Amino acid sequence: MTLDDRWLAAVWPFVQDQLPPAPAAVLEIGCGTLGGFVPALGDAGYRAVGVDPDAPEGPDYRRVEFERCQPPWPVDGVVASLALHHVADLDQALDRLRDLLVPGGTLVVVEWAWERLDEATARWGFARLAPPARGAEPGWLHRHRERWSASGRPWDRYLRDWAEAEGVHPGEQVLAGLDARFTRRFHAEHPYLFSGLAATSEAEEQAAIDAGLIRAVGTRYAATRAEPAG
């Protein structure tokens, strides 16, 4: 099982629990090259389409930015997993999410907040990194470890500079934008680093969070589109 497979398997129960029952129509934005949750959604009886410029080929995917996607049916649920923190225009993207959903439709968001990744949390993750597989691209934690070491800067400054250069939105900004457009139903901070650590489980990361050794960097959120007034 790849790290991406582990991540999808770990998050899928939350996603499924928050969505309306099948056969609801679900759109996943930012499904990536592997197709995200679309296969699991289909297996669970949902009508599902994944949207991403790098999506797989096939009838269940659209290779386009979600801001320009025209769903084939009214959308009962939208899933956005690690898709919002790097959009070019956050307000425009969130407005589009709201417009995609039918009134009363469900939005499920899985994200991370870079501003909560303090030095202690980063070092905890770095210490648990395995060497990259031969021929494989280094993971995101590997890249941060090497770039931070090469920068010679304090961790907080390095991370702020990276986020600014990459246009990564703070988790608090994403959350505020969501709450301004949707009726929040659920929000919690969750483990996130395990997604890049082959030998560390979500439960082990949660134990370190509970012990106060590290901070929870992940975010899980669910909300509904408010019914129109009147």
Residue spans for each PLM region:
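Substrate-binding/catalytic lobe of Class I Rossmann-like enzymes that use SAM or dcSAM, i.e.
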Residues: 138-200
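C-terminal lobe and adjacent flexible extensions of AdoMet/dcAdoMet transferase-like proteins
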Residues: 181-230
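Conserved class I S-adenosyl-L-methionine
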Residues: 23-32, 108-144
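A conserved beta-strand element that flanks and buttresses the S-adenosyl-L-methionine
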Residues: 79
